[in-house]
Amino acid sequence: MKKHLFLAITSLFFLGCSNSENSNKNPYLPNYSFSVDINLNLPTYSTLKYVSNAVYYPNAGVRGLIIFNTNGNSYNAFDAACPNQDLSDCSTMTIKGINALCACDKKEYNLFTGQGGMPYPLKQYRVEVKGDIIRIYN
């Protein structure tokens, strides 16, 4: 009985593990390493202190970042490149409320989930919050 319990727990452990490197594979978007700190006390980013607000940060990722406040002290950071388009003049997304809009195909992606009903969701990056500083990295 103990062997079966051990086997069941071990199986659940290995099934629950995932490699975040594999979950962000997208043939349209290269994988660049970066790390940026966003200071919420700066006027450009102060709107991120409020739920459901988003800002565009142009200097990281493939086409910049879209940073979104999900519930007060939790944030999502997505690449601003359209995830289902080759890189082109129209593939930088814009913020439209709680969605990101791809100008190429007019598809919208939810900034809470990154989903847009297409084969690839938004490319999501890691986020750490320490006080009024948001660190976003890949």
Locate each region found by the language model:
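Positively charged n-region of N-terminal signal peptides that target proteins for export
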Residues: 1-4
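Sec-dependent N-terminal signal peptides
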Residues: 7-8
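C-terminal motif of bacterial Sec signal peptides marking the signal peptidase cleavage site
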Residues: 13-16
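N-terminal pre-ligand scaffold of iron-sulfur
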Residues: 20-97, 110-111, 123-138
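Short cysteine clusters
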Residues: 82, 102-104
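Extracellular/periplasmic metallocenter environments
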Residues: 104-119, 133
